[in-house]
Amino acid sequence: MGPKYVFITAIIGVFWHVQGFPNPGIKQDKAVHNRELSEERPLEEQIAEADTVSRGTSKENQEMLKNDSFADELGLLMSVAEKEGDVKRSGSVRSSVGGHRGTLDDADSTKNLKPAEYFDSTKSMLDYKYEDDPDGLHQLDGTPLTAEDIVRKIATRIYEENDRGVFDKIVSKLLNLGLITESQAYTLEDEVAEVLQQLIANEAKNREKEAGDLDYAAVRSDVYDDDKQEGKMETRNKNEDRESSETKNEDSFSSKERRNELSPEEDFDDLQYFPNFNRLIKSLNSENDAKEKKTLITIMKTLIDFVKMMVKYGTITPEEGVNYLENLDAMIAVQAKNKLGKSFGSHKSILSEDKNVDESDSTKQEAAKMEKEYEALKDSTKPEPKDAEDKDKPKGKAETYLEAIRKNIEWLKEHNKEGNKGVSDNDLSKLKDFINQQADSYVEKGILDKEEANVIKRIYSSL
């Protein structure tokens, strides 16, 4: 009987402390109380209540995650194992639970309300695309992420930020939390490195493909333009052939005209030191004399270069070279006067004013001597030009000047530093080689025509 009484006493003690339904502490009007139970509250009150609840629940999470930029990756890796393990188990239950939840949510209108952050325009709408997946464990189509997807996501993050420190921070936190071991960390590093290398290779291929597409488009555009113009070009072939022949003739004429338009000062810098030669060039001012003037300038320059070469090799002294060039200019005046019938001034105007009287006399004597030698060696069978037209022919001027060059070479032989022994065959060979090189260079530069160069070569080869 003792235990029976004890059991009855315990039951009475339990029911003694049981309370009934609570009564309102404050007396309310019966109509207000019934309205709260039967009618839905105003929308403003529901929004305010939902806002208060949302702020209270998310405040602690925001405090914990605001200083950690990699919280999404950590949360993703920490919960991926549990998520993947429960996917199959929760697949069948989700439909029934979802349907039941939908019924409850429909009954409670506060469940459909969005948090205050949802209406904030500064936040991305992607953050609320999957509200039941805060860790980003689902893809865009809603399917859960696999381990390969997680590795690819980490590799993509490293590739976009171009920083390997992202992986180091994630692995160090996983190791500190004890979620992975060191061997798993090495395996994860190898997998991420492989995916990262594949991303880089794909990016390189895409760039090459884009560059190839641009080149192909440019080539196709050129081909299209060529095909478009081909029909027009065929109709104008005959006209272009005729125009091309005319253009060639005009180009040939313009090139010669352009060379003739060059002033003597541009072609011959040392012209100022030869006043008689300068007068001779200025006298050839007609169109027929343009080619002759160019030839004379070229020959004079070649002769000066030859004198410089002789001085360089020591064949003559610098004083003898200067004397030779002065007598050359004086002889030009004398022979031009005799052959062409033109006076280029007295010998006093030819020589420089800085020369003394003795130097002027010696120059005059030398010029007179050379004139006598020329008269003695002159071909007596050749008739003298009598008509003014014959005197003004370019051919006569060229022959006169070339004969003067021969006489100057003979004078150079006699005034060699070795006395009257003359110039050796070696010197003449050097002279011929030098003249040939100069003539070829003038042809390449466009100063002389090929025919003019051949004439000069032929003259010096006959010395």
UniProtKB/Swiss-Prot annotation:
Pfam families: SGIII
Segments of this protein annotated with the region Disordered: 87-111, 225-267, 353-398
Phylogenetic placement of the source organism: Eukaryota, Metazoa, Chordata, Craniata, Vertebrata
Cystine residue pairs: none
Signal peptide: 1-20
Top-level taxon: Eukaryota
GO cellular component term of the entry, any: extracellular region
Positions with biased composition (Basic and acidic residues): 102-111, 229-262
Protein's UniProt keywords contain Secreted: yes
Organism: Xenopus tropicalis
Location of the protein in the cell: Cytoplasmic vesicle, Secretory vesicle; Cytoplasmic vesicle, Secretory vesicle membrane; Secreted
Protein name (database record): Secretogranin-3
Oligomer and partners: Interacts with CHGA. Interacts with secretogranin II/SCG2. Interacts (via C-terminus) with CPE.
Keywords, alphabetical: Cleavage on pair of basic residues, Cytoplasmic vesicle, Membrane, Secreted, Signal
Role this protein plays: Member of the granin protein family that regulates the biogenesis of secretory granules. Acts as a sorting receptor for intragranular proteins including chromogranin A/CHGA. May also play a role in angiogenesis. Promotes endothelial proliferation, migration and tube formation through MEK/ERK signaling pathway.
Membrane topology term: Peripheral membrane protein
